[in-house]
A protein has these predicted regions:
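Class I SAM-dependent methyltransferase SAM-binding "motif I" and its flanking Rossmann-like core
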Residues: 70-132
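A polyampholytic, Gly/Pro-enriched intrinsically disordered region
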Residues: 43-57, 105-114, 185-196
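A contiguous loop/helix-start segment that scaffolds small-molecule binding in enzyme catalytic cores
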Residues: 55-56, 135-196
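Class I S-adenosyl-L-methionine
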Residues: 1-87
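Short, surface-exposed amphipathic charged segments that create phosphate/polyanion-binding patches used
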Residues: 36-48, 125-129, 178-188
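General beta-strand structural signal in soluble alpha/beta enzymes
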Residues: 61, 86-91, 142, 168
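A short acidic, often aromatic-flanked loop/helix-cap motif at beta-alpha or helix-coil junctions
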Residues: 31-41, 117-120, 174-177
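Short, hinge-like loop/turn segments at secondary-structure boundaries
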Residues: 13-14, 102-107, 128, 159, ...
Length: 196
């Protein structure tokens, strides 16, 4: 639904090669969205039938970049396995925008996805990531849904050491995006987080 709406807007500026109604738009199964598709359990080969017949296909994402912090790696992996050429194209990717805006190490970083929702497990994972960052200098990137931002921020402020630097970036692909990078000591005095 969102893809069709987007392509309709694109078509108003630049004509599509085919009428919108002629395009076959398929969504990855819900299970792939919930559990990810990096495990290799999802067989994406049937989605590539048109490409095997010589047609161009695309893989899109509603927010971010397919296969990077979003589902899609199974489709890309299947394309490689089937000998289909893969060309990655991107617009603004919030992870890289956040890293570039943070003032943290952009030469060595890791994206660790979502942290656990259960408070004790989340605090344990935060301590592990902080230890890794302090030991290696590697920036640790993670994401959270807006409705869990307050709980995440509370865990971070309570768990991290006072001198640890934390950058919180939100809505960076929007016109009113924000990024704030402070030590935990400073965050404890002003812990407000944007809800973009």
């Amino acid at each position: 639904k969102t893809t069709r709406a987007y392509l309709k807007r694109v078509n108003e500026v630049v004509a599509l090669c085919q009428p919108l109604q002629a395009l076959n738009i398929t969504e990855l199964p819900r299970e792939v969205h919930k559990k990810g598709d990096h495990t290799g359990n999802f067989d994406a080969r049937p989605l590539l039938a048109a490409a095997l017949q010589g047609h161009d296909i695309g893989l899109g994402s509603e927010s971010g970049m397919p296969a990077v912090a979003d589902p899609g790696s199974s489709v890309v992996r299947a394309a490689h396995d089937l000998g289909i050429e893969v060309i990655a194209l991107t617009g603004p990717v919030s992870l890289l925008l956040a890293l570039a805006s943070s003032g943290l190490n952009g030469q060595s970083f890791a994206f660790v996805g979502y942290l656990p929702q259960e408070p004790n497990e989340r605090a344990k994972r935060i301590r592990e990531l902080e230890s890794l960052a302090l030991r290696t200098g590697q920036t640790q990137l993670f994401i959270e849904t807006p409705y869990r931002n307050a709980a995440m921020m509370q865990s971070l402020v309570q768990t991290l050491q006072p001198n640890t630097r934390l950058a919180v970036c939100s809505g960076l692909t929007l016109t009113r995006g924000v990024c704030r990078s402070e030590t935990i000591q400073n965050w404890r005095h002003q812990p407000a987080v944007a809800d973009n």
